[in-house]
Amino acid sequence: MKILVVSDSHGLSEELTQVARRHEDDVQMMIHCGDSELPAHAEAMQGFNSVRGNCDIDSAYPDHLVEKCGQQHLFVTHGHLYNVKMTLMNLLYRAKEVDAKVVCFGHSHIAGTEMADGILFINPGSLRLPRMRKDKTYVILHIQNRHIHVNYYSIEGKIIPSLSSEFILE
């Protein structure tokens, strides 16, 4: 299963739509990890399973989602409610509570992937205001049973090999 994962687009609608259209025929799910700053009914948000970030005012967005992706559970949240700028520990505990092996989150605007205690944490970075690098990024997540490919792309659609990686879940 392939999943498009974006976060922290902060009001961008045209660019978000371009990214979605670029991959819509290749992915089975699209996830927005919050801070879209767009109403849930906005055209650019159509097709996205989205959560509420600290800058989102639309209460139609939930604080988190648990999605079934093949054999794996995926936990999606923005991250501000779990203090992710300081530690992933709170998010790790929540992932264990919902039996998720993969966690997608945003908030920090820092693109990166980390395996901790058998759980894969993925922050796709920001489509608008990246931190720690100049590239505005998103992720295509490819889950095949226990094998996971995490490919980072620039907003222009070019793969970023230095951020991309593969994992095998326990």
Residue ranges and their predicted role:
Residues K2-D8, H73-H80, L120-G125, N151:
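Active-site-proximal beta-strand elements of phosphoester/diester hydrolases
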Residues K2-G70:
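Core catalytic region of metal-dependent phosphoesterases/phosphodiesterases
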Residues D58, P130-M132, I159:
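Short glycine/serine/proline-enriched coil/turn segments at secondary-structure junctions
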Residues N49, V84-H147:
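Conserved beta-sheet core of the metallophosphoesterase superfamily
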Residues L16, A42-A44, Y61-D63, M86-T87, ...:
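Short, well-ordered secondary-structure micro-motifs
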Residues Q144-E170:
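Charged phosphate-binding loop/patch that engages nucleotide di/tri-phosphates or the phosphate backbone
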Residues S7-H10, G34-S36, N54-D56, G79-L81, ...:
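Active-site metal-binding loops of divalent metal-dependent hydrolases
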Residues V51-N54, D58-K101:
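Helix-adjacent hinge/juxtasegments
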